[in-house]
């Protein structure tokens, strides 16, 4: 009786762990932001609200205080999102993903007496590129966050918004950054997994794959239409390999020549 080839699996746990690691940094930066805001900017806003005229907008001093506070937040962000931490976070993610996929595809190959992971000359360069790209994604989250909170604070001060209203917007901004981190975690897990799977499948002589979705409510219609259909690695569908489309959790099941 022929042995059944283990299915290609999507590593949800790796994606969740990566998202949590990035969100830990975001939460830390969010706490620092609110602390500096409460201590240095809130008093300036309350001082202005207590005045009857608009002299606040005619004076440079209060805005200078705000600028210094924003600069403090930016400086502290460099300690939280320092290059070593960012690199370590990206590296841990990519290495965990590689280990997961390597074990998964090796088990598929064993059914046919093949081990595609014995020699992988492409892997080192692929890993370095993936780690570098993800380090950039993490840094970009920080940069976008800082640009947005600076805009929120200055707009609030100039428009005469209450300290609470501005603070609420800062809290909301943290939530937006967290959602961005979750998107990147799933998106990158799928993309890197799809490319690793394709390389390892081709390494063991597999030229075709069957598209398989995660079979849940999040699957988009275009991917449901591809499910269980067989494609050539040399000529994949227009959306690319399983996992390459944005936030895709689909996988490629190997189709061996004797099937």
Functional labels for PLM-detected ranges:
Residues 172-259:
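Acidic, glycine-rich two-metal-ion catalytic cores of nucleic acid-processing enzymes
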Residues 1-176, 256-259:
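N-terminal leader/targeting and assembly helices and adjacent pre-domain segments
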């Amino acid at each position: 009786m022929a042995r059944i080839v283990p299915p290609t699996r999507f590593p949800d746990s790796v994606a969740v762990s990566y998202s949590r690691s990035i969100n830990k940094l975001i939460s830390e930066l969010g706490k620092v932001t609110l602390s500096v805001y409460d201590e240095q900017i809130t008093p300036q806003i309350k001082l202005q609200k207590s005045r009857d005229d608009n002299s606040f907008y005619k004076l440079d001093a209060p805005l200078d205080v705000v600028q210094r506070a924003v600069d403090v937040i930016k400086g502290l962000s460099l300690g939280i999102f320092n290059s070593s931490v960012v690199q370590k976070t990206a590296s841990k993610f990519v290495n965990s993903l590689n280990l997961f996929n390597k074990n998964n595809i090796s088990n598929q190959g064993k059914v046919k007496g093949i081990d595609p992971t014995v020699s992988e000359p492409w892997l080192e360069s692929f890993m370095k590129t993936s780690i570098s790209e993800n380090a950039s994604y993490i840094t970009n989250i920080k940069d976008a966050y800082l640009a947005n909170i600076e805009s929120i604070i200055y707009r609030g001060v100039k428009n005469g918004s209450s300290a609470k209203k501005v603070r609420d917007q800062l809290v909301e901004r943290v939530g937006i950054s967290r959602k961005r981190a979750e998107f990147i975690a799933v998106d990158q897990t799928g993309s890197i997994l799809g490319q690793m799977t394709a390389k390892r499948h081709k390494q063991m002589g597999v030229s075709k794959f069957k598209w398989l979705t995660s079979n849940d409510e999040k699957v988009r219609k275009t991917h449901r239409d591809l499910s269980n259909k067989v494609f050539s690695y040399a000529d994949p569908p227009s959306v690319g390999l399983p996992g390459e489309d944005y936030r895709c959790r689909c996988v490629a099941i190997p189709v061996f020549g004797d099937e």
